[in-house]
């Protein structure tokens, strides 16, 4: 589990086929205190297992599913990635709950400088528009961000100078592809509201709009 608060960037030192997937060797631009072999680390928002940790360098194995669903397969040797270590119970929840399971990729439609800030506009991935709400949270390449605005086809986020400096968004350009993870809570609520029995018949869930309104989740 992660929060979308990026510790820093990393650079891909090596990328090669391995066991049907790919092996990435990554060099972080920050120290990895108390490294644990087999710990989870988010690379561009993709939850992976770190091994062969040596100083700031580590290796991850990327499965065919992750290569197909994320932008990792498109990254070249020398490319930048965002890095976050797994959440500890004692950590601050500075962003929002992020699973590290990417839902889709989407292109950058526009990069618009606004003084020291940058406004990015992205295409809404197919079937994910219902989870993207104005002023809600979204994860882009592992970064917890707030949606500025959204319509049926596009959504935008405003990036502060600090985020531009410490993440890969500073180098992101129109036409680039990013990883998207929508709000996990929204997906679970939808699932609970559409529960089906073992025979495929829809069951009436105790968690319905009336229940949510009664307990203050809906107005």
Feature roles, as predicted:
Residues 1-219:
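Conserved loop->alpha-helix
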């Amino acid at each position: 589990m992660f929060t979308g608060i990026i510790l820093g960037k990393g650079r891909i030192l090596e990328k090669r086929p391995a066991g049907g997937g790919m092996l990435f060797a990554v060099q972080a631009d920050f120290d990895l205190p108390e490294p644990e072999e087999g710990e989870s680390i988010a690379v561009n928002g993709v939850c992976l297992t770190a091994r062969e940790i040596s100083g700031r360098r580590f290796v991850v194995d990327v499965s065919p599913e992750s290569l197909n669903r994320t932008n990792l397969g498109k990254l070249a040797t020398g490319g930048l990635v965002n890095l976050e270590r797994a959440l500890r119970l004692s950590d601050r929840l500075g962003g929002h709950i992020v699973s590290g399971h990417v839902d889709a990729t989407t292109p950058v439609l526009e990069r618009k400088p606004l003084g020291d800030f940058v406004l990015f506009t992205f295409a809404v991935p197919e079937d994910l528009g219902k989870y993207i709400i104005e002023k809600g949270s979204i994860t882009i390449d592992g970064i917890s961000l707030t949606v500025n605005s959204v319509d049926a086809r596009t959504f935008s986020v405003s990036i502060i100078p600090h985020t531009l400096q410490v993440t890969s968004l500073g180098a992101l350009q129109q036409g680039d592809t990013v990883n998207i993870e929508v709000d996990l809570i929204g997906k679970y609520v939808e699932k609970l509201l559409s529960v089906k029995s073992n025979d495929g018949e829809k069951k009436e869930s105790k968690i319905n709009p009336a229940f949510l309104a009664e307990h203050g989740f809906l107005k």
